[in-house]
Amino acid sequence: SRVVWASSETTLGLPFDRQQPAYAPMDENHPLYPESSYALSKVLGEEMARQFNRWTGIPFIGLRFSNIMEPQDYAQFPTFWDDPMKRKWNLWGYVDARDVAQACRLGLQADINSAEVFIIAAADTIMNRPSRELLAEVFPNVPLHKEIGDFETLLSIDKARRMLGYNPQYSWRQYVGL
């Protein structure tokens, strides 16, 4: 048996109202800064998963979902573009609901025997501006942890790609004309 459950990007300190990210793209090693009872419950769930895995050997896969969107939600994205502050709260992240389903399936099939957490986000941001530009404007003191592509997510999905085979298939760019 194995457990796959929904954790949350909020474990990382989102929304970024009181502090800034330690670095970007944020990954699973980023310090945890739960800023709400919801986020704290997710952090505690992740710790319980580690302990239950240690006690029982049952694998636990926690999926730290970004802001889950459906295709009909993409029409609102252009309303965010005039002011990057509107969506800075989660580093302009999102994930398509169909990619959430993919991540759940991959978690169930993964050859993992430990307790692991994975950030699950789209490969891009919700913005029509380069990610590096957004970061420099809104979080000028946050260092880049690695090189990033023009519109690459600032919520790193590298671990999910590597360990789960996660490969986001959907982007708002397929639905909204630029």
What residues fall within each predicted segment?
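Short, flexible, mixed-charge acidic loops at enzyme active sites
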Residues: F16-A24, Y74-D82, E133-A136
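Catalytic tyrosine of NAD(P)H-dependent dehydrogenase/reductases that use a Tyr as the general acid/base
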Residues: Y23, Y38, W92
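Active-site helix of classical SDR
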Residues: S37, S41-L44
